[in-house]
């Protein structure tokens, strides 16, 4: 019976055979990072080709969206940076909420080490950048080297496989989440122009309504999506960058499920038995299937359901499209300028030197002062290698650069600095981790005493 079942289950439809290579690629943990690299390479090739003008023109085409008299007309570039990136920041907000409630940031004891390290990884790069650029308009770019591209950083660690301990990946994930929190605060507080109080109050009112829906037990994503669009439009009109709306809405999404676990197990078994005993394609069999599907939706929290549902869209559409539309900088004629320009130098040094130095130094101070404990199996060399990988600013740095400089030469210089530093930091961090694993694990751990102190 089981062999017959396996035989039937193994028969794939023609369309499944056709798309199976793409499905296998999408299931690779590093697939999103590979797609980002391809998107960036395509943008750079196009921007440095004889058809450079068409690359710029395609993103400047205006697009209109809205309902009734409320219409927004923005270029494709702005719809990507203000609209689609709001969905990315919504996903970031969901990840932050999950980490705070049930993840590495649940307790201050667990959060202290990556939190302090992340602060160092934002403060030191910003200081280095400001020292490089001095005064003037270029100062506005101080937030660019503060960012870490979590998708790329984790993608590099995944490619290293079992050469690194799992706790190092957890540390980088927690650090990147704190880094994202700081980035959101920086965007909201320092890259906001004129504030329109009425629109801001409308947005906050929408957030309050969404919290009310949460308390009432409303879990349908469509309800939160509808009010989320209203919050986004109000934030856009308020002068605060529209992506902040995504984070605010994420904090209102329910993180609890609405079904008892034991009841779900018993009810699920009963429904499966009912389905098994019913006639194929009968009303009873369809009722059992739909009821079981509803039970599955109820046992999973809206936060997890949305996070799981949005992740592929963000990883395989939004972020590659953002990279493709923002990474196209013309190297021809700019490289000679960039190697001497304070903005490109400041961004590059901030990411390549400031990030690893800040993370490692603040982590070391936290452990030596006994303010925080590091995972006992990690060595300082592993933390340093991971800190270097966190210097991959890429998409997040490009995004903040677009907020800081808009268009023009300063934006091009910051892009060149970001791309160069991200590449070198990723390679150097990978080499350090690869070499240390090849040499063995004889080096002493960061916190020898943490095993007895763990809870």
From Swiss-Prot:
Keyword Cytoplasm: no
Pfam families per record: Na_H_antiport_1 (PF06965)
Membrane topology: Multi-pass membrane protein
GO MF annotation: an example: sodium:proton antiporter activity
Main location: membrane
Cellular component annotations (GO), alphabetically ordered: plasma membrane
GO BP annotations, alphabetical order: regulation of pH
Keyword Coiled coil: no
InterPro entries to which the protein is assigned, alphabetical: Na/H_antiporter_dom_sf, NhaA
HAMAP family tied to this protein: NhaA (MF_01844)
Function: Na(+)/H(+) antiporter that extrudes sodium in exchange for external protons.
NCBIfam families per record: NhaA (TIGR00773)
Family statement: Belongs to the NhaA Na(+)/H(+) (TC 2.A.33) antiporter family.
Protein name listed in UniProt: Na(+)/H(+) antiporter NhaA
Organism taxonomic ancestry: Bacteria, Pseudomonadati, Acidobacteriota, Terriglobia, Terriglobales
């Amino acid at each position: 019976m089981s062999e017959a079942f396996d035989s039937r289950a193994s028969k794939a439809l023609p369309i499944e055979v056709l798309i199976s290579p793409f499905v296998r690629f999408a299931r690779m943990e590093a697939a999103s990072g590979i797609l980002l690299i391809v998107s960036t390479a395509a943008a750079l090739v196009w921007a440095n080709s004889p058809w450079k003008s068409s690359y710029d023109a395609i993103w400047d085409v205006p697009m209109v969206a809205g309902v009734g008299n409320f219409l927004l007309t923005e270029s494709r570039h702005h719809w990507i940076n203000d609209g689609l990136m709001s969905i990315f920041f919504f996903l970031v907000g969901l990840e932050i909420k999950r980490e705070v409630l049930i993840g590495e940031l649940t307790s201050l004891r667990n959060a202290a080490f990556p939190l302090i390290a992340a602060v160092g990884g934002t403060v030191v790069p910003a200081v280095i950048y400001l020292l490089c650029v001095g005064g003037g308009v270029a100062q506005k770019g101080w937030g660019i080297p503060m960012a870490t591209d979590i998708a790329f950083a984790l993608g590099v660690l995944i490619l290293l496989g079992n050469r690194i301990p799992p706790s190092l990946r957890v540390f980088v994930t927690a650090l990147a989440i704190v880094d994202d929190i700081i980035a959101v605060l920086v965007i909201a507080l320092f890259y906001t122009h004129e504030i329109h109080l009425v629109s801001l109050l409308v947005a906050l009112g929408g957030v309050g309504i969404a919290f009310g829906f949460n308390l009432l037990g409303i879990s349908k994503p469509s309800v939160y999506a509808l009010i989320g669009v209203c919050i986004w439009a109000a934030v856009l009109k308020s002068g605060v960058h529209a992506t902040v709306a995504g984070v605010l809405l994420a904090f209102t999404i329910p993180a609890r499920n609405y079904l008892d676990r034991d009841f779900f197990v018993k009810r699920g078994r009963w429904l499966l038995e009912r389905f098994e005993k019913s006639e194929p394609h009968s009303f009873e069999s369809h009722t059992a299937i739909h009821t079981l599907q509803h039970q599955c939706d109820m046992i999973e929290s809206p936060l997890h359901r949305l996070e799981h549902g949005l992740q592929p869209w963000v990883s395989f559409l939004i972020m590659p499209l953002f990279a493709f539309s923002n990474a196209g900088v013309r190297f021809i004629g700019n490289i000679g300028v960039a190697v001497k320009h304070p903005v490109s130098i400041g961004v590059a040094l901030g990411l390549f030197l400031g990030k690893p130095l800040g993370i490692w130094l603040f982590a070391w101070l936290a452990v030596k002062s006994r303010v925080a404990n590091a995972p006992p199996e990690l060595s300082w060399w592993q933390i340093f290698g991971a800190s270097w990988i966190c210097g991959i600013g890429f998409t997040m740095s490009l995004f903040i650069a677009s907020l800081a400089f808009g268009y023009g030469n300063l934006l091009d210089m910051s892009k060149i600095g970001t791309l160069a530093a991200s590449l070198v930091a990723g390679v150097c961090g990978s080499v350090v981790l690869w070499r240390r694993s090849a040499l063995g694990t004889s080096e002493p751990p960061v916190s020898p005493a943490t095993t007895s102190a763990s809870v």
